[in-house]
Amino acid sequence: MRTLLAVALLVAGLQAGQATQSTKGSSTTKITALIYAPEIEPSLKFWVDQLGFTKVVEVPEGNKLGFVILVKDGAELMIQSTAGVKKDISAMVEYARPAACLYIEVGDFDDLVKRLGTAPVVVPIRTTFYGMKEIGVREPGGNIVLFAAKVQQSATH
């Protein structure tokens, strides 16, 4: 059963790679994750100081940050504070709570694990049947982040 699922995932991935152009509607040019946090500053320590992202945009909200854009190696992440959402799009306030789960593939799994420091682990290190080594943590904003590397790219753990 696991082999069948792994083959299905592989085929789906190959098909997704082949389907680069849509024939209906406008084209999709980019997808960027937007996560919410009660306060952005604690999340910056995790994403910037520990994981090496760079803050390229910041929007203040009073004496704190209301919104930031972080980048690293072509990946982009937006973080918006609850206060920022309330001011910017008040209809979204009830949804602006930590509820995201991000899945991020990395090149050096062991280095990543070291960089996580004391982040609360919610999924202990595991090797999956689909060939990934993973660890899941809760980032300071309350969102879940699963980090993964292809087994052949990670050292034995």
Model-derived features: positions:
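Helix N-cap motif at beta-to-alpha junctions
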Residues: 39-40, 107-109
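Short glycine-/small-residue motifs
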Residues: 144-147
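Hydrophobic h-region of N-terminal signal peptides that target proteins for export
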Residues: 8-17
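Conserved active-site tyrosine of GNAT-family acetyltransferases
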Residues: 43, 47-48, 116, 139-142
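Vicinal oxygen chelate
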Residues: 18-34, 54-105, 111-138, 149-157
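Mature N-terminal segment immediately following signal peptide/propeptide cleavage
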Residues: 32-45
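Sec-dependent signal peptide recognition
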Residues: 1-7
